[in-house]
Amino acid sequence: AIVDVRSSPYSQYKSEFNKEHLKDSLKKNNITYVFLGEECGARVSDKSCYTNGKVDYSLVAKTDLFKTGIQRLINGADKYSLALMCAEKDPITCHRTILICRNLIKEGIIIKHVLENGDIELHEDSEKRLLKLFKLHHPDLFRTEQERLNEAYARQGEKIAYEAEDQKELI
């Protein structure tokens, strides 16, 4: 099954990636299409999930709606091979990794990312790249690897998170 986690299931540049067209194409190939953009999308409507006008993934992860989406993914993984679909090419620049997969691995789900060139990257390797991105990959006397990884996730989340165009949207 393809699980679309885009907040808006439409492409400005490639109409074949619009929800209806994609759903029909996948159905012809016996692949189920599921839209979870409301539950797991990067642009959340819950105003309490914003800090200074930007989505805060640590707050999103605590919402009932997001937890429902994660549970649907866990349940779906029992029945199907799932592929999460979004718009970013590199897993570490997408909320798929920084928000969704981070929470799925806590539930014991094995994550493999398909890279732009078709190669497969284990989630652990994505996390290593994330640590390197912020120069947190070297051992530290004062912090565990998990603490450094948490910092890398937080910093990347801040970097890539959706920012409300109009702060009035959040009032």
Task: Give the positions of each predicted feature.
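Residues lining hydrophobic/aromatic ligand-binding pockets adjacent to catalytic sites
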Residues: 1-171
